[in-house]
Amino acid sequence: GFEDYADIVIEDGIIKKIGCLDGDYDNAASQNNNQSNSNNKNNKTSDSNYEQVIDAKGMIIAPGLVDTHVHFRDPGFTYKEDIETGAQAAAAGGFTTVMCMANTKPVIDNVETLKYVLEKGKKTPVNVYSAAAVSKDFKGEELTDFKSLKEAGAYVFTDDGIPLKDELLVKKAMEEAKALDMPLSFHEENPAFIEQQGINKGAISDKLGLGGAPALSEYIMVARDCM
């Protein structure tokens, strides 16, 4: 491996060379820190060697970021956002891979809707993946067809911000997901204990008379699903 302060040549969004600008990764990696630093100072390549040079001072150079929870609101709520505009915003922020949630209209609980999202995502500048729902129409009553959704390209099963209150359904979902080697993501919050969404229960919520959401609502659901 190579760990040092070094020059990086980035072209077309790809790291083309690491190390001395007129050397290469292997040569730079084979030298000690002092030698590498010396070469970096003495073997600079002038800007004239490149058709375009972007000054990246003050910027961050990093691998593409990944957001595993996005809401592009497509289909059904495109007056808020759609896959194209969401992907453009992601790219502008340095995110090259995103995972769309299934709370669209219709819900991504069927192969047709899932394929719509994935196909539209292929036309954007980033990798657009999608979750599929655990339960049909997010009702928490009947499981979706995990197998066909996985085969169609789903990466994870989740009912997004809606907690699954049926313990038997959760157990069946876990068993099926395990058999298919697929991850599940649950919203672990029991609404029976919540007086007011959007604020934790505590001194401030009591002072404002809002009731709030106690930590107990989360503890109970997590404990149930870990048993």
Regions found by a protein language model. Name each.
Residues 67-70, 95-100, 126-129, 200-210:
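Gly-rich Lys/Arg/Thr-decorated short loops/hinges at beta-loop-alpha junctions or inter-strand turns
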Residues 1-64:
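Histidine-rich, glycine-flanked metal-binding segment
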Residues 57-121:
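Metal-associated gating/positioning segment near the N- to mid-region
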Residues 117-123, 146-151:
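Acidic (Asp/Glu)-rich catalytic clusters
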Residues 68-81, 129-142, 210-215:
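Active-site mouth loops of central-metabolism enzymes
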Residues 26-28, 32, 50-57, 87, ...:
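Short amphipathic alpha-helices and their capping/turn segments at secondary-structure boundaries
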Residues 84-108, 124-136, 150-165, 181-189, ...:
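Divalent metal-dependent hydrolysis catalytic cores, especially in the metallo-beta-lactamase
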Residues 141-227:
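Histidine/acidic residue-rich metal-binding segments in metalloenzymes
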